[in-house]
């Protein structure tokens, strides 16, 4: 019996040592970097940049894979159900909070482990430069006077742009036609007049603003952005809403802490690298890297804020029992 117990203990110890060695050697193969939105949009552009920077640091390819759909639901479900070994990573955004609270998935944001944040940006309400509205109030006043006539494009149901758009319109008493449209097509539709406005990723339409083809009527964040200092926030205009669109990393629940720590370190080093930071500056994005602990606190606060916004706007649909 003593010999048998010794064998069992020895086998268990060997297994634990093997697991520890595996974590110490991680990564030993390419990492899937899952992007929740389609090619060519803001999430895709930013995601591919950070994936490339992380590849150099980790010594293994970090391979971008687009899995769009459901305002991030497809990606978050895929990563949630993946093996918790750090080889499948979600390029998260504020959509991890919006898509869970709008009911696109049957779980909460806490169903995944979150590595940290890379950057953040406001969400602008965009119209064509020669549009007849020069303020958000002018747009919303016409929308209230002519319900279900003005069109507003956004990324997808449950996305941050969807929630921002619905919040801005509903809190203004406006009934708009909301159009889920892929990133590049949103800009085309604004310029062609197929949509009257769009709620978009900040840096992509910003270049059209600089080129004199579009204008921002408002942004969603709590304070004005240095890149567009004359554009007011929604809160300044009397709307009870305030949030930024952030980007970061998430993995399957139960991923070993040692692996999460390595991912966090690589993410922060990549975010602060000269190449990535320089690119973010050119794109007019706010580089704001933070690790697991700080990001956990931010997510909790942001989630409470978004739930309040969604309830106020009448679009809270979480499938989780409270």
Regions found by a protein language model. Name each.
Residues 17-21:
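N-terminal signal peptide c-region/cleavage motif recognized by signal peptidases
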Residues 40, 94, 128-133, 154-159, ...:
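Short coil/turn segments
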Residues 118-124, 218-253:
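Periplasmic-binding protein-like
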Residues 10-12, 22:
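Cleavable N-terminal signal peptides
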Residues 28-30, 171, 257-322:
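An extracytoplasmic/periplasmic, membrane-proximal ligand-sensing/linker region
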Residues 1-9:
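Bacterial N-terminal signal peptides that target proteins for export
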């Amino acid at each position: 019996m003593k010999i048998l117990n010794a064998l069992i203990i020895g086998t268990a110890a060997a297994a634990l040592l093997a697991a520890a060695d595996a974590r110490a050697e991680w990564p030993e193969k390419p990492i899937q970097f899952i992007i929740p939105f389609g090619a060519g949009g803001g999430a895709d552009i930013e995601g591919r940049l950070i994936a490339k920077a992380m590849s150099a640091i980790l010594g293994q390819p970090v391979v971008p894979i687009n899995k769009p759909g459901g305002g991030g639901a497809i990606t978050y479900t895929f990563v949630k159900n993946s093996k918790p070994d750090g080889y499948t990573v979600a390029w998260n955004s504020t959509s991890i909070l919006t898509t869970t609270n709008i009911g696109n998935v049957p779980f909460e944001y806490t169903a995944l482990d979150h590595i940290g944040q890379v950057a953040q940006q406001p969400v602008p309400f965009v119209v064509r430069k020669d549009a007849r509205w020069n303020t958000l109030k002018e747009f919303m006043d016409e929308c209230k006077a002519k319900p279900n006539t003005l069109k507003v494009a956004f990324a997808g149901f449950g996305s941050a742009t969807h929630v921002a758009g619905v919040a801005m319109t509903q809190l203004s008493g406006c009934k708009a036609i909301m159009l889920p449209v892929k990133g590049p097509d949103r800009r085309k539709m604004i310029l062609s007049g197929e949509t009257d406005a769009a709620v978009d990723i900040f840096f992509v339409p910003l270049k059209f603003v600089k080129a004199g083809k579009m204008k921002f009527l408002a942004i969603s964040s709590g304070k004005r952005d240095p890149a567009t200092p004359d554009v007011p926030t929604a809160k300044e205009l009397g709307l009870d809403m305030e949030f930024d669109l952030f980007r970061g990393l998430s993995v399957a629940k139960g991923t070993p802490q040692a692996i999460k720590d390595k991912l966090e370190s690589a993410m922060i080093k990549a975010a602060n690298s000269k190449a990535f930071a320089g690119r973010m500056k050119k794109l007019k994005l706010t580089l704001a890297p933070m690790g697991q602990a700080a990001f956990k606190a931010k997510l909790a606060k942001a989630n409470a804020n978004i739930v309040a916004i969604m309830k106020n706007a009448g679009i809270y649909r979480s499938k989780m029992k409270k």
